[in-house]
Amino acid sequence: MASREGKRRNHNHDDEKLVPLAALISRETKAAKMEKPIVRFGQAAQSRKGEDYVLIKTDSLRVPSNSSTAFSVFAVFDGHNGKAAAVYTRENLLNHVISALPSGLSRDEWLHALPRALVSGFVKTDKEFQSRGETSGTTATFVIVDGWTVTVACVGDSRCILDTKGGSVSNLTVDHRLEDNTEERERVTASGGEVGRLSIVGGVEIGPLRCWPGGLCLSRSIGDMDVGEFIVPVPFVKQVKLSNLGGRLIIASDGIWDALSSEVAAKTCRGLSAELAARQVVKEALRRRGLKDDTTCIVVDIIPPENFQEPPPSPPKKHNNFFKSLLFRKKSNSSNKLSKKLSTVGIVEELFEEGSAMLAERLGSGDCSKESTTGGGIFTCAICQLDLAPSEGISVHAGSIFSTSLKPWQGPFLCTDCRDKKDAMEGKRPSGVKVI
C-alpha cells in the first residue's frame, strides 16, 4: 500500500469497444439525467464481548438546511481491549471528517476533497483519543454514500464489499492484518516494530502474526496507544461511482469475515431485503463458526429510482473474461460523457484509491488545503484544524524523503503536535513516546 501510487484515476480508453456506438448513444440519451438512487439499509448483530459499534446516519447534509445535499453514512467499529475507542470514534469521527472539508464546495469538489478529509479525520480522532490516556483500540470502516458515489475509508479488518448486478463481488477495503498483508508487515518492521507469533513455554509459536510490543494482530487502528506509533490510523480510501443499476454494500466486523468469504456473504443474502439480508449474513456466520466474537453486519442497498427503466441487455460477447475484467473501469479524461456511457452499461467507475501510510503522500499539495484567506494570513493544521500563524505551521513535506515536492515551505501545514505524530508514525522518532 505504501508503494502504491493510488491517486485520481486518469487513463485513456480510446479504442475499447464494449457495445456498438449507436447503442451507447441511445442509452446515454435515455439516462442523460441520472436521478439520485434510493438508499435502504438493514443491520444485525450478535454480541459476545460488547465491543462492536455501528454508526448509521441517513440525513447528513453537505449544505446546512438544504435537503438536496443529503448523504448517508454507515460505519462499523470493532473495538478491542475495551470499548472506549470504538465508542469515541463512533461519536467523533464524522464531525472530524466534516470539519476538514472547506466550506462552499460544489458537490463534485466536495467528493474530490473527501478522501483527504477522511485521512485528516481518522488521524485527528486517533490523536484526540490517545490524549485521554486510554489503551483500547478499534477498527473503523467508514462509508459515505452520496448519490451513486460510494467512498470507503478503513483501518483494521472490518471489511466492506460491493455486490453488483450480475453477481460480481469486489472488496472496497483492504484488511490490515499482519498475517495476511505483506506490505504492512514490511512497513511495521521498517518503522521499528517487531512482527512475530506469541511464544509459549518451550519456544513454541502459536496464533496469528502480531506486532510487538503490545501483541496486536492489526497494523492499522484508532487508539492502541500502548502498542507503538507504527500502528497507524491512516486509512485506506477507495471511491467508486456505481452504474444506475445500483449495488449492495455489506459492511461487517471480522466476526462475519472469519466465517464467510466475501463471495459467500454476498451469495447467502441475494434476493432478500437489506434488513433480512443483514440478519441472514449474521445467521450464516454463526451457523458456520459459532459465536466466538462480536458479529456485526450492515447491508446497504443503493437502488435505482422507481421510475428507472433498465436498459436492454447487450448482445452476448465471445470474450466474456475480457468484459468481466472491465467491471472496475478507470476514470477517463473525457470524464463526463464517458462516465454516463459507462454507467449505462453497468460498469463501476473507480474514481480514487490510496493506501499509503505516509501523510506527506495522503495530504498532498496545498492547492486544495483548508487554508483561510480571510484576515491575518492565518493557516489551519491539516489534521487537527488548529489555526496557525505562518511562522507556526510546519509543512507536511518538510524533511520527508517520500515527498515528491521540492518546496517544503508549501502546504498543507501541520501544528507541532501533529508533526510529532506524523514523525512517530513514520519511524522518525522512538516508538513509545506518545503525543499528548
Swiss-Prot record:
Mn(2+) 1 binds at D78, G79. Residues 30-302 form the PPM-type phosphatase domain. Its cofactor is Mg(2+); Mn(2+). One of its GO terms (molecular function) is protein serine/threonine phosphatase activity. SMART domains: PP2C_SIG, PP2Cc. Gene3D superfamilies: PPM-type phosphatase domain (3.60.40.10). InterPro entries: PP2C, PPM-type-like_dom_sf, PPM-type_phosphatase-like_dom. Pfam families: PP2C. Keywords: Hydrolase, Magnesium, Manganese, Metal-binding, Protein phosphatase. Its EC number is 3.1.3.16. It comes from the Eukaryota. Binds 2 magnesium or manganese ions per subunit. CDD domains: PP2Cc (cd00143). It catalyses: O-phospho-L-seryl-[protein] + H2O = L-seryl-[protein] + phosphate; O-phospho-L-threonyl-[protein] + H2O = L-threonyl-[protein] + phosphate. It is an enzyme of class 3 (hydrolase). Mn(2+) 2 binds at D78, D254, D293. Belongs to the PP2C family. PANTHER family: PROTEIN PHOSPHATASE (PTHR47992). This is Probable protein phosphatase 2C 15. It comes from Arabidopsis thaliana (Mouse-ear cress).
